[in-house]
Regions:
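Active-site acidic/histidine clusters and adjacent loop/turn architecture
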Residues: 135-203
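A general structural signal for short secondary-structure junctions and capping/turn motifs
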Residues: 3, 138-139, 223-226
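Bacterial N-terminal signal peptides that target proteins for export
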Residues: 2-11
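Catalytic cores and adjacent binding grooves of peptidoglycan-active enzymes
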Residues: 28-35, 39-58, 62-84, 217-305
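Acidic, glycine-rich low-complexity/disordered segments
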Residues: 199-216
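Solvent-exposed N-terminal domain segments of exported/luminal and surface proteins
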Residues: 45-46, 50-136
Length: 305
């Protein structure tokens, strides 16, 4: 799973042509949506093949109501089911539809390339400053929790911790949600099987900590961290090779221009390690504008072909 999901140009042209041959957008709105299931729902079906997604168009809400059926992680014969509205990949319950602007979509174009500060324009810099402003982050839309709460049974701390398991990972152990136990074990096995060249030898021999489950929110936001679901891991090497590893720590040292930190001055795992994580459905935080180079999250929906 390597490429970004995005609507094709042909698809947009088809939409334009469809509406251009109809006299009223109001007359065509419901029939069009009734027969055209959003591409994003198909992305989730591919990303989570063991989960059922049954979409039905709700004329009153003018949106797709998706029945999601999940097998219990501990007892596959037991099923959990919930109806959530698609709402541009926010997966909201009916009583949250009037608050949809408070949530951001779960699907976005994940970048595989680290943004190079040498290419930033003045406009880019202004946007970065606004995005990372503490007040803006506190008051910005949050990640909707409803889909993940259903899939991982992690509505609260007690329910989450019923599913946390400890597994060997690389040269250490880590606590994660049991649903990602197998993909993470495959990651570990593939990495340990890589040829021990100088880069890999240094990477494995200097690995001092791997952090998984931790109950917390994302820094400066109201969104739950993926660590609090047991779906994220941090890989920390000894002394970070004397490099920078996390945007917020750098911002404390250089509050006025932290975003201009050269890529060469940031620690990063070997590219082959990042690639193995991607193969198993994990995104790397090093390509975010708010780069978190130690961080990996399980998001197979962002990596679907």
């Amino acid at each position: 799973m390597k490429t970004k999901h995005r609507f094709s140009t042909q698809f947009f042209l088809l939409i334009i042509l469809f509406f251009s041959f109809n006299a009223s957008a109001k007359e065509t709105k419901i029939p069009f949506k009734k027969w055209w299931i959003p591409q994003g729902i198909e992305i989730f079906k591919k990303a989570y093949p063991d989960i059922q997604f049954i979409p039905t168009y709700d004329k009153e809400a003018e949106d797709w109501l998706v029945t999601i059926i999940v097998c219990d992680a501990k007892n596959p014969q037991k099923k959990h089911q919930e109806d959530l509205y698609w709402c541009d990949s926010k997966f909201l319950p009916k009583d949250k539809l009037d608050q949809k602007d408070n949530y951001r979509p779960l699907l976005y174009n994940y970048s595989f390339t680290v943004p190079d500060p040498n290419t930033f324009t003045e406009q880019d810099i202004q946007l970065i400053k606004e995005f990372t402003d503490r007040d803006n982050r506190k008051n910005s839309p949050i990640d909707p929790p409803f889909f993940y709460d259903l899939v991982y049974d992690c509505t609260n701390r007690e329910s989450t911790e019923r599913h946390i398991v400890s597994i060997p990972f690389l040269t250490l152990n880590i606590n994660v949600h049991e649903r990602i136990k197998e993909p993470l074990e495959r990651v570990s096995k593939k990495i340990m099987a890589l040829p021990r060249d100088e880069e890999m030898t240094k990477f494995l021999s200097t690995l001092t900590r791997t952090d998984g489950y931790a109950w917390r929110t994302v820094r400066d936001t109201q969104s739950r961290s993926f660590h609090s679901r047991g779906l994220a891991i941090d890989i920390l090497p000894k002394n970070y090779y004397q490099r920078i590893i996390y945007w917020s720590w750098q911002k404390q040292l250089r509050p006025d221009d932290w975003y201009m930190t050269e890529i060469s001055k940031r620690w990063a795992p070997p590219k082959k390690v990042i690639e193995i994580f991607k193969e198993e459905g994990f995104i790397w935080g090093g390509t975010w504008i708010v780069w978190d180079n130690m961080h990996f999250e399980y998001h197979p929906e962002l990596l679907v072909d």
